[in-house]
């Protein structure tokens, strides 16, 4: 199959979250299955600064956006042996950030990604490249299935091309004023209850849900959750209309990148069969961060966006107890100003068993995974989550809230027929989190049982290989819809 991935971020070129990890890893697994896979993303300043052997292309497109023609130039490089195209427009993409600043999202994001979506489709024609599948990701690419269905339904060039739309996080829907439609090149007739209209605004994800051939989310549990009013973010009714075309496919992690046996960024490599290096990494992390060097004290790691979605309000309520507990907490992340300030003020109190590390420090993240005994993910909701899988790979036992992909990957001995690989809690309360964390801390004192659980987690398979096979099945469903 010829498969084109269209995404607003792709590791290693540009990243703000887990979306980039998926779009950087899944194509490689599909390529290994023998498919013709290609990727396209915007040519951001971040990409330009990174180098990546990017070359100027000969193709360009002219797109009518915001009442004037905007030119896009195409560049190209490779991700291993996968062709990668990048759409350049300095007005829209030569900025310090991908989507906005700490003050908020860029006010012209609707124009930026309308230009991107239209530019992608125009490029395909100029290249005479007809993908079997265009795989779109999140609201930034949601216009592609909409355009193909509503504007290009009679275009023979795309007549055999199908679309898969993946929802990585339903909370981000691409909501814009009705008046923005004209500037995005969208016909006002699409502003209806059965297309783009959503409480007086344009909802791009709604449009994609209603027009993509197949929709999927990034875990089976999250797929079920978003069909309910509690977790559907206002789109549960629309999703229910398409429930026969809605699937859950658990994300994986890149096992070549996240590999404690070969990771050069950690102090000592280790494997499930020879896990002794784990203790050396813990000692190195404690030393680096000024924590007491003690093997008997469980080290709890957390690498996360610092937002309420990730459970920071629960952590906030427990900080006084954590400061007095026989454990160490190492936290890395950036996010909402409220939590940044709170954690910085807490760290300033001189608590000697807590290390707060604010900012994006990619070299520290693998050291935390490798050095932690316990890994904390108390999310309010979590479509999939990658941190818990990386933690398992690096021998850290997760403590998670039982939601979304966390429920599909972490099994607590209390309520799972499967052998346990972590600890979980149901109620979104500080007490429920504290009870689960306390059970983990207590379990750590039984070294033999803990080592067994740790090795079980490390031996689990959360690679992209299984996920890639499931995506192949979705692609075949789409082709069948196209009569192929």
Curated annotation (Swiss-Prot):
Which EC class is the enzyme in? transferase
This protein's pathway reads: Glycan biosynthesis; glycogen biosynthesis
Origin: domain of life: Bacteria
Can you supply a Gene Ontology BP term from the record? glycogen biosynthetic process
The transmembrane segments are none
Q: Which residues bind ADP-alpha-D-glucose?
A: 15
User: Could you tell me the keywords of this UniProt record?
Assistant: Glycogen biosynthesis, Glycosyltransferase, Transferase
Checking SUPFAM superfamilies in the record gives:
UDP-Glycosyltransferase/glycogen phosphorylase (SSF53756)
Give a single Pfam family match. Glyco_transf_5
Question: Listed GO molecular functions?
Answer: alpha-1,4-glucan glucosyltransferase (ADP-glucose donor) activity; alpha-1,4-glucan glucosyltransferase (UDP-glucose donor) activity
Q: Which GO terms describe its cellular component?
A: cytosol
Write down the chemical reaction(s) this protein catalyses. Answer: [(1->4)-alpha-D-glucosyl](n) + ADP-alpha-D-glucose = [(1->4)-alpha-D-glucosyl](n+1) + ADP + H(+)
Name-wise, this protein is Glycogen synthase
